[in-house]
Amino acid sequence: MPQTKRTPAGEALSGLILDLFRLNSLLFTSGDRLVAGLGLTSARWQILGAIVTAERPQPVAWLARDLGAARQNVQRIVNDLERDGLVTFETNPHHRRAQLVVLTDKGRQAFDAAMRLQLPWVNNLADGLSLKDIETMAHVVTTLRGRLENGEEPAERG
């Protein structure tokens, strides 16, 4: 028999998901304001961060996978970053058509400047929150993301 009602946990999670949607929008808006003076947007900053985190040049498809984003969207942003001299493309010895994205010195400087701006912003945002609550939230988000990435989402029931 199909479920007709959310469980208490399902109801709470549904509310949390709606709040996370709103939070994501607010984070992007706030991030855009924070890094606008650097000629960046939150989306560009996010891509630069993925490149830095990767620690070695990767193709756009891999960056998109790491970000959980559509390859076409990441490609568009990477093309903009390349046009502005923040990244460059190098030949991929393993795949002729999938060029590697490489951070330039200008890109590294822009990312580092963004992170310097982020430091007081994130510390102020965290003010008054307990480390335990932040760690619990991080655990919940990581668990949910893992379930969705691994295809553990529940099958639709008719």
Task: Kindly give the residue locations of the regions a language model identified.
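N-terminal leader segment of winged-helix/HTH proteins
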Residues: 1-38
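Alpha-helical linker/hinge and terminal dimerization helices associated
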Residues: 23, 27-30, 34, 67, ...
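N-terminal helix-turn-helix DNA-binding core of bacterial DNA-binding proteins
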Residues: 25, 29-70, 156
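Charged, amphipathic alpha-helical coiled-coil/dimerization segments
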Residues: 2-4, 28, 79-139
